[in-house]
Amino acid sequence: MGQKLSGSLKSVEVREPALRPAKRELRGAEPGRPARLDQLLDMPAAGLAVQLRHAWNPEDRSLNVFVKDDDRLTFHRHPVAQSTDGIRGKVGHARGLHAWQINWPARQRGTHAVVGVATARAPLHSVGYTALVGSDAESWGWDLGRSRLYHDGKNQPGVAYPAFLGPDEAFALPDSLLVVLDMDEGTLSFIVDGQYLGVAFRGLKGKKLYPVVSAVWGHCEVTMRYINGLDPEPLPLMDLCRRSIRSALGRQRLQDISSLPLPQSLKNYLQYQ
């Protein structure tokens, strides 16, 4: 999965890393996942029509970024100096469990690349280079370069994330990560390379929160793909049974469902058909 870097991080844009640290795993057992997260991730990913409904909002952005005409899931940032620029997603969430993928090439992140959630009131532009998402009480963000969590960052220090990091350590991320927003529990979490990193923020209940990022790198392009969502109602017994069967088979053997001695209608159900 991602890699750990030791030493202080300087506020400079580095196009080519001088050293590629050895890959390493999480310390200890994976933190407990939110209820029903495995169920959500086991479901087929949302189709393009749903992804477009949950895409970046071309009407809710800094003027220095734009949603691409040929790829409505991706925004592009103009190379404007001394400016931090953000964009919100179209859909805000007040209930349910939701997951979306952020694809942000590591070489396009620069000194302040922040991913998180925000209310409709959070600012989307700031003069200078800063961790804009998480800078006030209206947003919650993970600075991908510094491996720090920010909320009300003008008044509160950042917190190391994942939690196993030391005070002078950072976590080098791959190009993609998953954001997990559980509005029923009021938590925000992240998944990297299939590893759940634990709860980043709590206390989000009662709000309506939108996907958001803020960027400083000129010509960076960031893509958001909504994975899926689950309403807060308890899952039906049939869904729980399907999840149990698919878990018993494992991802590598799901293709064997078609050869099981079961009625075709049940095979179809197990394959979300």
Swiss-Prot record:
Which key words tag this protein in UniProt?
Answer: Biological rhythms, Cytoplasm, Ubl conjugation pathway
- Tell me which residues make up the SOCS box domain: 234-273
User: Where does it live in the cell?
Assistant: Cytoplasm; Cytoplasm, Cytosol
- PROSITE patterns membership: B302_SPRY, SOCS
Keyword Transcription regulation listed? The answer is no
One Pfam family matching this protein: SPRY
Stretches assigned to coiled coil: none
Q: Which GO terms describe its biological process?
A: intracellular signal transduction; positive regulation of protein polyubiquitination; proteasome-mediated ubiquitin-dependent protein catabolic process; protein ubiquitination; regulation of circadian rhythm; rhythmic process; ubiquitin-dependent protein catabolic process
Molecular function as annotated in GO: ubiquitin-like ligase-substrate adaptor activity
Question: Which residue windows does the record flag with biased composition (Basic and acidic residues)?
Answer: 12-34
Where does the record place the region Disordered?
1-34
Q: Where are the transmembrane segments?
A: none
InterPro entries with a match to the protein in the record: B30.2/SPRY, B30.2/SPRY_sf, ConA-like_dom_sf, FBXO45-Fsn/SPSB_families, SOCS_box, SOCS_box-like_dom_sf, SPRY_dom
Q: Where is the B30.2/SPRY domain?
A: 34-233
Quick one: a GO cellular component term? Answer: SCF ubiquitin ligase complex
In what pathway does it function? Protein modification; protein ubiquitination
Per its database record, what is this protein's job? Answer: Substrate recognition component of a SCF-like ECS (Elongin BC-CUL2/5-SOCS-box protein) E3 ubiquitin-protein ligase complex which mediates the ubiquitination and subsequent proteasomal degradation of target proteins. Negatively regulates nitric oxide (NO) production and limits cellular toxicity in activated macrophages by mediating the ubiquitination and proteasomal degradation of NOS2. Acts as a bridge which links NOS2 with the ECS E3 ubiquitin ligase complex components ELOC and CUL5.
UniProt family annotation: Belongs to the SPSB family.
Q: Mind telling me which PANTHER family this protein's record contains?
A: SPRY DOMAIN CONTAINING SOCS BOX PROTEIN, SPRY DOMAIN-CONTAINING SOCS BOX PROTEIN 4
| Subunit structure of this chain's protein | Component of the probable ECS(SPSB4) E3 ubiquitin-protein ligase complex which contains CUL5, RNF7/RBX2, Elongin BC complex and SPSB4. Interacts with CUL5; RNF7; ELOB and ELOC. Interacts with MET. Interacts (via B30.2/SPRY domain) with PAWR; this interaction occurs in association with the Elongin BC complex. Interacts with NOS2. Interacts with EPHB2.
- Any domain commentary? The SOCS box domain mediates the interaction with the Elongin BC complex, an adapter module in different E3 ubiquitin ligase complexes. Essential for its ability to link NOS2 and the ECS E3 ubiquitin ligase complex components ELOC and CUL5.
The name this protein carries in UniProt is SPRY domain-containing SOCS box protein 4
Taxonomic classification, please? Answer: Eukaryota, Metazoa, Chordata, Craniata, Vertebrata
Q: Which gene encodes it?
A: SPSB4
